């Protein structure tokens, strides 16, 4: 077992994580009913992490801090949809915690996972439990607890993933949309060595995943677990597979083998309050610019608001009926670089 995560190992872990969710993206799409029933969480998360994988293939990170920084920057720039932006935030917080480190042992990696969760909760304007936020939070806590007991990274991550799946199962009753659809959340599946941390995180994540159905009223209504939570756990499982020397998944499973699938026909379009899924990137006018006034404005004209940022740019995801107003207001904080607007009806 690996005692510590190096830059080269972290790179391979991300490549494995990207392959794992790509192989199951349609299964994740089939669970996606929250925050809106558009069936694209698997696609968005897989394409988001694919940008990090591409960036890492071109890099030769000399440390875990550098590898995680490349990953976080690429994820922010390539984030698609609500689930992609939240995924980028989980790794942004992790990257900040690993900054300057040559290698990371179980305790350091577990603590970094927890920092990622804190970053995600802080960036989401109205955090909803029974989602990837719940799954990642409980998984990270399990990772920290397991690492504190002296477990290696593999064992720690596996335990966290197990806990995450347990929480995911409860997302259906926690979220009414998932309960109605009958699925879980799509976005959220040697002492101090990395393997133990990942084992614990995966174990905890698995435990956390199941309850997401009960925790989120939307998921409960749909009868599914959280798609984002499931997707996150798949990425962690791929990372753990690299630590264990297991192969990267190559083929996506056939649709008929899916055990869970949301009934999208049962999810009426009137549940979509805001029509346009709006995602855009703004280059900051200055590094220390205060985005709180912008957060307040955007939350007043839409929902599902998430803002991720690094030193030079910020990325906004919001559902709104007035995307033009969102873009105009945001340009007070810098220069618009990229925008994508989709009609969700």
Predicted features and spans:
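N-terminal loops that bind phosphate or other acidic moieties
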Residues: 1-345
